Amino acid sequence: MLWIILAIIVFIVAATLLLFRLEDLSHLDRDDYPIKDATPSEANREVLGRIRELGQSSKGLRGKARLMALRKHMDGLSEGIELASELRHCESPRGEWVLAPGCDTRRRILYIHGGAWAAGSPRSHRAITDRLSQITRAAVFALDYRLMPENRFMDGVRDCREAYKWLLKHGPDGAEPVDFMVVAGDSAGGSHTLGLIAWIRDNGLRQADAAIAFSPSTDLTLTA
């Protein structure tokens, strides 16, 4: 009986490698980046401290408890930060409008947060969306897309698509056509951003006027 189980496991692994083998992107790696002899800035030390805090927030936990701790920590990242923007909850599509004083509601940004597709929310990224609305004078819609593992990856993708179509015709005050449209996101949200604009192109929708992908996850083969 044992050898049958082992044979099945070997077959599954072999079939996976054969059918889902992806391109090796390691040839794109570079090792000639210039190294500057400089003292790390205070901002650099603060970022490293935040990363350490993220690891400490779930130390000793496993499984669902670890994930819940990470989510709670991320949602607290913007706590205590003074925001200039008005925040408005939106039920469908689920998300949050971030409106800096004097922003033009016909100028819109769909912001897709990061968090490894399993954490993060409009709340966790308010420091970013608040600043974006101020700088661009645009109404920012931070999408609260469905996360894994409670949902499938494609559920989050579909949420992004539906939100984009909705934003073309709706602003924070109701039905209103868009004049200028941007899609932006960080990390996992940056990956969703790139996938979304390709889908927009392939489906003949009004294309975004700009797309911003902050540190997007682009190589899921993990070879580069």
Regions found by a protein language model. Name each.
Residues L6-V10, L17-E23, G55, A84-A224:
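Alpha/beta-hydrolase superfamily serine-hydrolase fold, recognizing
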